[in-house]
Structure formats: structure tokens, C-alpha cells
């Protein structure tokens, strides 16, 4: 009976706090486990200890029995618990019958247990010896191995990582992943490669429901309840499946408003009788009316109206009143005048006094005084008593009064913008090479200013026209003058035919246009050109009198034939400019004094001329052919018009906002136009973007005479009266959404100034990144 009660108490009250779970290897050690179980059941055979199955173990014992092996100890615990359960089932009836009779015995057993517990605390007790013997028989675990190395199941949930709520990637560089309750490192489980991952995907049917625990690095299999919970959260439903979303509403409080009086006291008797105080007040008011002391409302209003008098309303009364209130509550003080500077002193420093050039510029702006930097001219006196009266004093005081009286005042928030922020970020010129940087050659031979220059399509020869009435043909590589053609008048413009199959130079001198065969280069090409210009083709079209009076075609005379002149086109006014079409069959001339016949188009193959315009819309300064489309650019003094030669209509009108246009150059692709003006500006037009300039460049100090695009490289150049040739980078992208990139690269200033003239014309080499410039110093310079 005592044995059964002890087992019962052991199963209910004194369960061990540290449970050991059996591993899968218990079946391999059955013999050792049976011996160990036999030793526990028959303690008399293995030890002299008075402990047995009746002995009760408590967790607070200083020398508590501990199992060193998970397998054997857990097996022993399972055997004992199963035997205890069998004893309990077999002796339930006996325990119920003898429960009352054994109360005394239980007390005695407890006393014995306490005595045996005291004896167990002693090191010389037999219980300690039996524990040591039992511990020695159990195999010890290797502490160097990770606790979950032998099993990849999730049964070792008692292992806890104590690192806390920290990012686990902090342990990526270490072999362990944290620390357990004994402050021992938790070694990371072995990680497979991609092949292992692929095999697990194929072989493991539960791979899709396996997740990795970031605290321990183990693979955790999700249960059906976990998956159902995840599905409910993903679908946006309540995680708890037992929750009823549409359960019936219970009205804990009524929704009907019940109106009930706070108090239901019956009215007093005096509420039905007239008020005595009101009766006295009315009697006093009646007496005041009889005596004339009190006036009616109409009489009071009439007296107020008489005091106010007639009232007149302003048409904008609301606005004036609002402005009046604003001035009262938020007044804006008048701006103070600028304090006088050193330039206004009666004895200013010498650097503040005007020199001859500054005085001339100041006097030149007499009609536009607002453009002057100073409204007066600084003067110097020896003493203060020599300073005369200020002649502009009354006028300046009067203008100051007008500003204070008439100019509206308003507060403006000043924007503090860094100047560097407004400057666009441009690439370095070193990254945009090649471009001309130095002067390589000077062509000398003319005796007067050189007005025009043109290059052969192959880039071997150069032609120039000068005011000394000569046309010179140069060899570019050596700088040698090959041929000189003398004319009767000043040569205004020369242009080499862009067709490489012909060798023709158009020379504009006076009112004659000469078509010259330079007799340089390929002899076959020279002969072919002579054959083309030898005889005039038959005319199938009858020319009008308007064209006949404007232009006449004729063959050159014998003396001119020896010089190379083949055809002479005589105009009725002096020619200023000549330009070729890209194919080399058409050329156009400009006569600024020709009114509505200022621009003429000539066809070389048929020796026929046309007047494209019947009315004059300004003085034509420059004309140009489109390189791709049948369009004709006509520049007047202020605007540029683009005409379609096929449809014979105006396509677009470009607004330059300049005083006088000097020249034009079109990009080889035909979508961008560069314009030079006499008011120191260069205008870049994007023909697909707008009719206004895309960018205005003020790179020169004087009038810009000429501009030119390179045929192959993204370069353009400009020449000005400040003796400078400025080379710039002009990249045009195929992407229409990307704006052109314009970067000034190099300023080449080697020409000399003559009679306020500098560089008159610029032109590019057709193949190399070289630029030619002509100047008033009668030289032609090559920059490479």
C-alpha cells in the first residue's frame, strides 16, 4: 500500500521539472536500458542505498538526480511513468477503500521522507553514492557538437536564442547564431548549396510549407492551422475562424429617443395675472410721451439723418476703403535713395573719371539715357568752392516726387539664388576635341581687305575675293597662290560649287556674276566643266520682260576666257551675296537695292533665271538653300522667312528680335539655323521647336559678320569686328526630345584691325576640323 501511495504522489505532486524527450535511437540500446531498469527496480542488488521506487525526489534537493544521456534517462522516465500509471489503474478501487485508513500512515511516511532527505544532504550518504554510480553508467554528451545536430526536427523547441529583438544579419560573419540560457554559443546548422535546395524542392513534399526560423536557423514546418491562419490574413478576413462577423445586434441601449419633461410642476397662479412691474413701466412711458420727453423711432431716425446730411458714394468705395485700411495696418515706406558714391565726389579718384572712349559711348546713348551706367559724367574740381550749381537738381526732385506720389508700392520677397546654380553645367572642352586651337598658316597676297573665302569640296584648294579687285586660288597644304584672276570691280563674294563632279567658282563682282573654271585639280574634271559651259542649251520657255530687264546670260569674251571665265550673268543692281544649292545646279544671288527683285535663282544646266518673289517685304540681306528639303531661307533686316519652292508658299517666319541680320548658316541635317547680327549677337534657331531663338549667344564685343557650320563635325565658328574667331561645340541629337548642346570652346584672335573692321568671313574645311578666316588686314588665316 505504501508503494502505491508513493507512486501516486510521485505522479501528481513531485513531477520532475526538467522533462527529457526520448530520441529515435532508443531502440538500439535496449539491453543497456533493461539493465538500467532492473537496477532501479531492485536497488538491493546493485547498491546498499535505502532508496527505491518508494523514494520521492524533489526539485529543491541540492543533489538532484540528473541524467547525462537523453536516450537512457528519457527511457527510464518513460518506464517509470508507465509503471506508475498501471499501478494507479489497478489500485484505484483499493485506494478509494483504504484512503481513510491510511491517513495516519501517510503522515508517518512523510516524517520518514523528511528524515531520509536530511540524510541525503550528507556527502557520506548511501543515496549520493547510488546517484554517482548511476551517473557514471550513463554516457556523456559531447558539448562541442550543436544541440540539434543529430536531428532536423522541430522537437528541440526548448532551445531558446537569448539575443533578443535584434537584426539577425549581425551574425552573418560568425559561425554561431546566438546564445542559449547557459550562455553557450548556438552553432549554425549546416547550410546546403543550390543543388541541395533543388533536391529538397523535388523530394520533400512539405517543402512548400517549410520556413526558416531566423533565431535558430532551423527549418520549421507549418501546421495546417498555421496555413489556414495565413490564408485568412492574405484574403483580408479575420484571423480567428471562430469569430462570427454577422452575429445578431444586441441593443444594450434603446435607439428610440424618449422625450420627457425634466419637471412637471403646474404653473403658478401669478403667471396668469398681468405683471405689476410692466404696468408701472408702461405708465411711465405714456407720461413721457405726453410731456414730450420721449420720441418715437421715426423721429429719432429723422434727427440722425439730419445730422449726417446728404451722403455720396464713390464708384470704387470698396477698393479704396480696402487700400485705405491696408495703408493703416500695413504701411509700405517709400524706398530710400541710393547714397552717393565715389564717382559723385567733387574730387573723385582718377579711375572713376571717363576716358575718351567711355565719354564717346556715354554721349552716344543720348537718345537712350536709361541704358547708361551713370546718369551723369564724373568731374573733378580743385576745391569745393569751385563746384557750380547742380543743373539737374530741380528735375531730379520733381521725378522723385512723381515716384512717391504715382508709383504703387508693394513688398516683394527677395530671392537669394546662387549665381552658380543658374549657370548650366557644361562639359570640359578637353572632352570635345578635336577642334582648332592654334593658327597654322597665313595666306598673304591681297592688298586690300578680303571679303569672302570658299573651299573646294575635296579640301585641296581655296578661293578668296578681295577689295583689290582680284580673285586668288590657293593651295591649302603649301599656302602657295596658284592663280590670280583680275576683275573690273570689287569682289563681294565667292562660292565654290559643292558638286565634286564640277569645277566651277561663282564670283560676285559689281553687278556681274562670273562663272569661273579655276583649271586646278583633275584635268578630266576641268574639261568636263568646259564642255558643260561652252554652249548654251536651247530655250523652250519664253522669258518675261520682268526677268529680261533684271538678268541676262552671256558667254565670256576672249580676254576673260583666258582667265578662266566661262559665263557672265549680268544683273541690274550690284550683287552682294551668292550661294549654291547642295546639288550644284542652282545658285541664288542677292541684290539689296533690287526691291521686289532683290533675290534671283539661276539654273546652270538650262541657263535660266527666276524671280521667286513678286512683292518686297523688306530689304533682303541673305539667302540660303535647305540642304535636304526644297525650302528657301530669306533673311531681311529683322526677320527670316522660310518658303516652300514646290508649293510656293510661306512655311514659317522666324523672329530674331535684332536690329540687323548679317549672315546665316544652316546645320547639315537642316533642323537648326545659326544667325549672325550686327548687334553683337548669335542666334540659334531650332526649326522644330519654335519661331523664336532657342539660345542667344553674346560672345563677341562688336558686330558679328559671319557664321558657319562644319559639314561633318559638331562645330560652328563666328567672326566679328573684334578681330576674334570663336569656335564652339554644337551637338544636335537624333532624339527630338533632347535639346542641342552648345559649348564655347576656343577664342582665336590673331587678325589686325583696320578701319574698325576685323574678321569679315569664316569657312570650314570640308573634311578636317580646320577653319579659315578672312580679315580687314588683307590676310587669310588657317586655324587647326
Swiss-Prot record:
One of its GO terms (molecular function) is ribonucleoprotein complex binding. Residues 112-123, 138-148 have a biased composition (Basic and acidic residues). GO terms for biological process: maturation of 5.8S rRNA from tricistronic rRNA transcript (SSU-rRNA, 5.8S rRNA, LSU-rRNA); maturation of LSU-rRNA from tricistronic rRNA transcript (SSU-rRNA, 5.8S rRNA, LSU-rRNA); regulation of hemocyte proliferation. Required for maturation of ribosomal RNAs and formation of the large ribosomal subunit. The keyword Repeat applies. Residues 27-36, 45-54, 62-73, 84-111, 149-158 have a biased composition (Acidic residues). InterPro entries: BOP1/Erb1, BOP1_N_dom, WD40/YVTN_repeat-like_dom_sf, WD40_repeat_CS, WD40_repeat_dom_sf, WD40_rpt. Residues 1-11 have a biased composition (Basic residues). SMART domains: BOP1NT, WD40. Keywords: Nucleus, Repeat, Ribosome biogenesis, rRNA processing, WD repeat. The keyword Iron does not apply. It is found in: Nucleus, Nucleolus; Nucleus, Nucleoplasm. This is Ribosome biogenesis protein BOP1 homolog. WD repeats lie at residues 445-486, 488-526, 570-612, 615-653, 656-695, 699-738, 754-784. GO terms for cellular component: nucleoplasm; PeBoW complex; preribosome, large subunit precursor. Its main location: nucleus. Residues 1-159 are annotated as: Disordered. Belongs to the WD repeat BOP1/ERB1 family.
